[in-house]
């Protein structure tokens, strides 16, 4: 996805609530420049004004003014990582997932708008490749890896992404031959309600 298209998608997402609040204008597209040529794959809008973007070269951007300006709030030392999913709880708290084989799959969390980040998970299994994450609420979430030993691997957090544990895979159907997650935009694992998850 090009920078312009990601910015346009964000503008549309931010424009729809304006109509819902009675301003009376139909949804429209508005280009919001980010000031970078990074390829963005993750988007989390938490309000009309506040949103987060995550993409290549370990880049995380944040806006607090509806996309007029963007701040680079990337985790230090992450320039070789590919961020493909970001889940934000508000303007200060977010969790971002880097994809890749082995140690390239990582999770970071910020509690101060990206001023500082903590690495909360680094994959140590060379067979695992984490694709996406989702949250039920501000504490409970899951992350999904491509199959390991014939079944998708799932991580779980109970503290908002500050720590993660691999869940047992008993009861999970075997993956089909060649089946894997799609590591872009964070849509291969989606929470629905307080305990259900869709996996694709």
Which functions belong to the PLM regions below?
Residues 21-200:
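Residue-level hotspots at or immediately adjacent to binding/recognition sites across diverse folds
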Residues 13-23:
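C-terminal region of N-terminal signal peptides and the immediate post-cleavage residues
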Residues 4-13:
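Bacterial N-terminal signal peptides
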């Amino acid at each position: 996805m090009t920078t312009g298209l990601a910015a346009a998608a964000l503008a549309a997402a931010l424009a729809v609530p304006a109509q819902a609040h009675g301003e009376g204008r139909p949804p429209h597209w508005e280009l919001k420049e980010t000031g970078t040529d990074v390829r963005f794959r993750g988007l989390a809008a938490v309000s009309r004004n506040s949103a987060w973007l995550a993409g290549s070269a370990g880049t995380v951007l944040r806006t607090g003014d509806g996309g007029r300006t963007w701040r680079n709030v990337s985790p230090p030392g992450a320039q070789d990582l590919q961020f493909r999913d970001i889940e934000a709880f508000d303007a200060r708290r977010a969790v971002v997932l880097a994809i890749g084989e082995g140690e390239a799959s990582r999770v970071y969390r910020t509690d101060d708008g990206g001023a500082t980040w903590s690495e909360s998970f680094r994959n140590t299994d060379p067979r695992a490749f984490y694709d996406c994450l989702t949250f039920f609420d501000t504490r409970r979430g899951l992350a999904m890896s491509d199959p390991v030993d014939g079944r998708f691997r799932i991580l779980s957090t109970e503290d908002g992404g500050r720590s993660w544990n691999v869940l047992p895979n008993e009861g999970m159907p075997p993956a089909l031959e060649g089946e894997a997650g799609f590591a872009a935009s964070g849509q291969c694992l989606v929470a629905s309600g307080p305990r259900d998850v869709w996996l694709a």
